[in-house]
Amino acid sequence: MSRRAVYTGSFDPITLGHLNVMQRAKLVADELIVGLGVNAHKTPLFSVDERAELVERAVRAAGMQHVSVRTFEGLAVRFVRDCGARLIVRGVRSVTDMEAEFTMILANRKLDPEIETVFFMAGDEFSHVSSSLIKQITPLASDEELARFVPKEIIPDLRAKLAG
């Protein structure tokens, strides 16, 4: 039997930390679905379709197999169920991240007690990386510097979005 997991997030933009979580999630799942959430409370840099394309490009470049990208609106736990999965994958960088995730786990358990959440702690090299940081440093950093934080394949897209 195949084990399917879903890694949800906004991925705006995808970072090397996100890719690291995906690679590690593949250790516990045969198939990984990256669920790009549409959050009405956030103003994204990239549209959901652009984010999907960037994630697909980064996953391909990383050579990951059995990883697909889908978009969703609404509750993540419902999306996970609709995907036929029972595992939600989450990456955490800090105690603050864990506190927010803990609240979400409790809500998800009430909504669907059959769905479990698996956490992957960020490696030291990714514990400071966030999409917000990327947006802040892109106008100032060289491509070589940015490649320490994001897949090099998406740097031109970042530059185009954040130009001027």
Regions found by a protein language model. Name each.
Residues 1-164:
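Nucleotidyltransferase catalytic core that binds NTPs
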